[in-house]
UniProtKB/Swiss-Prot annotation:
A cellular component term, taken from the record's GO annotations: cytoplasm
Pfam families listed in its UniProt record: Nop25
UniProt feature coiled coil, ranges: 49-110
Cysteine disulfide links: none
Keywords: Coiled coil, Nucleus, Phosphoprotein, Ribosome biogenesis, rRNA processing
Chain intervals for the UniProt region annotation (Disordered): 99-138, 209-235
Subcellular location: Nucleus, Nucleolus
Protein name: Ribosomal RNA-processing protein 17
Recorded family membership: Belongs to the RRP17 family.
Example GO molecular function: 5'-3' RNA exonuclease activity
Gene name per UniProt: RRP17
Function noted in UniProt: Essential protein involved in ribosomal RNA processing.
Additional comment: Present with 2950 molecules/cell in log phase SD medium.
Length: 235
């Protein structure tokens, strides 16, 4: 039995492959004239179809963008409503504090009403209090100068002088210095809460301006293409 070389073995495999390809190959290639004519003459039609698809894609993107904007607006309105509800609750607390302050004032008035006249003994006590008040330096220093004119008229001149005795002044004006700091803090808190309720301290949020979509003109496309070609040449 003859021994086959490597070349003969490889050549035999090649012949077998070509034989198999011929067995399952195509016998004849036929073209559809109508389809061929449609392909060769339909460049403009396919271009219009691509443009139509691009416009539909842009419309769909615009629709999705509007939906997203409406969702953002709903979310902002929801946040505003929650903030207004919060301020409304704070205003209710403010009204409660005002009622408490009114109750405190009524209690002070009741205490003052208790200091009414209870007979001649109370007049004596009032006389003692007047003597104590006379020992305190008053806010007005009186210096009376009387001059007699021909028509018998008298003139009294009084000089104003500041008084540093705040306790005496507060007592005259029915003000309690012990509660002054507390009342001041309550007034500041009420003012800030009322300002928040009116929206004075909130800055108006400016909405970002949405850039509208537009097609480029023929000259703009030409300039952009020219710039792109120049960049390619530089590279």
């Amino acid at each position: 039995m003859a021994v086959h070389t490597n070349r003969q073995i490889l050549t035999r495999g090649k012949n077998y492959a070509t034989k198999q390809s011929k067995k399952f190959g195509t016998d004849e290639v036929t073209f559809d004239k109508d389809s061929r004519l449609d392909y060769l003459t339909g460049f403009h039609k396919r271009k219009l179809q691509r443009q139509k698809k691009a416009q539909e894609f842009i419309k769909e993107q615009e629709r999705l963008r509007k939906i997203e904007e409406r969702q953002k607006i709903r979310q902002e309105r929801k946040e505003v409503m929650e903030e207004q509800l919060k301020t409304f609750k704070e205003s209710l607390n403010l009204e409660a504090e005002i009622e408490d302050a009114k109750n405190d004032k009524t209690e002070d008035l009741q205490v003052e009403s208790d200091e009414s006249w209870h007979g001649f003994d109370s007049d004596k006590d009032d006389g003692d209090n007047d003597n104590n008040e006379s020992s305190v330096k008053p806010i007005l220093k009186k210096g009376a100068i009387t001059e007699i004119y021909d028509d018998s008229t008298t003139v009294e001149l009084e000089t104003l002088e500041p008084n540093d005795n705040f306790e005496y002044l507060a007592q005259l004006n029915n003000v309690k210095l012990e509660k002054a700091e507390k009342v001041l803090k309550q007034s500041i808190n009420r003012a800030t809460k009322y300002a928040k309720f009116l929206g004075v301290d909130e800055k108006q949020k400016k909405k970002p301006r949405v850039k509208k979509f537009r097609y480029l003109t023929k000259n703009e496309r030409r300039i952009n293409q020219r710039k792109a070609n120049d960049n390619k040449r530089r590279r």
